[in-house]
Amino acid sequence: MTRRNGSAPASGSASGAGCHGPLCDLTGPLVVALLAPDERAVEAVFASAASRGADLALLARDLVSPALDEVGQMWHRGEVTVAEEHLATAVVHRAFTRCASHVPPPPLGAPRLLLSCLAGEFHELGARLVGEVARGAGWQAEMLGANTPRDAVLGYIAQRRPDAVGLSCALTGHLVECGKTVAEIRRLAPGVKVLVGGSVFRRDGDTCGLTGADACFSDAVALRDWLVANRPAPDGCGEPCAPGPEALRKKVGGSRRTRA
């Protein structure tokens, strides 16, 4: 593929400060595969990481995150286009999801984690990867997606009563909204754990205490460890639990009668 200046990733740049542990040598090949784009090559890189013992959380922190950081830096240097950057994000998401499909699903009655990006937040890949990590840690994960209004998040919490809520915040300008959302969740559902994460907390750890959350995470490994350590018993969903199939059938039936 031709770059604007004909360059490959800068030498050593993909294995810099954002790279951790034994997967650093795979970051460069992953960047090349993402920008090709070559999904088979991406999956081959993931398979190589898995052969070294990397689980989904390590894959996200030590490989995907530094690779996408490098793609972003290449965009800032004028070496790739916005379209190429967006395509790289889509490719890595598809490949990561396929990789996660080999992990056994959480057991019946597993605790539930609700994930959502704040209103105005359009960077949703991190939260989607975290959802796969959570499932691998034995939690059911439900993702509301990007730019979800606060009222919609609160309404879903009232309906589903998850065991924990994870809010994704990438931009410093959204920290106030993050704090307000955390406070509203506390008032609505005092027993629900509220977690926050995103690149803004990776850039400045001091912002964590400003949100009022139960825990703050700058990477998927720390979140995985928290989820494993704080996993409720399978039958401890609390009251009221999420609506069962019968309640959902009645809701759908009522909706159909209303339209008729």
Model region roles, listed by residue range:
Residues 117-125:
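Active-site-adjacent loop and "lid" segments of alpha/beta metabolic enzymes
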Residues 135, 143, 148-206:
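Cofactor-cradling patches in redox/metallo enzymes
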Residues 1-107:
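Long amphipathic alpha-helical segments
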Residues 111-113:
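Conserved hydrophobic helix-helix packing surfaces used for dimerization/oligomerization
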Residues 128-142:
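Short helix-loop-beta junction
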Residues 55, 140, 163, 214:
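Residue-level detector of anion-binding/catalytic polar loops
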Residues 200-260:
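Peripheral docking tails and interdomain loops at the edges
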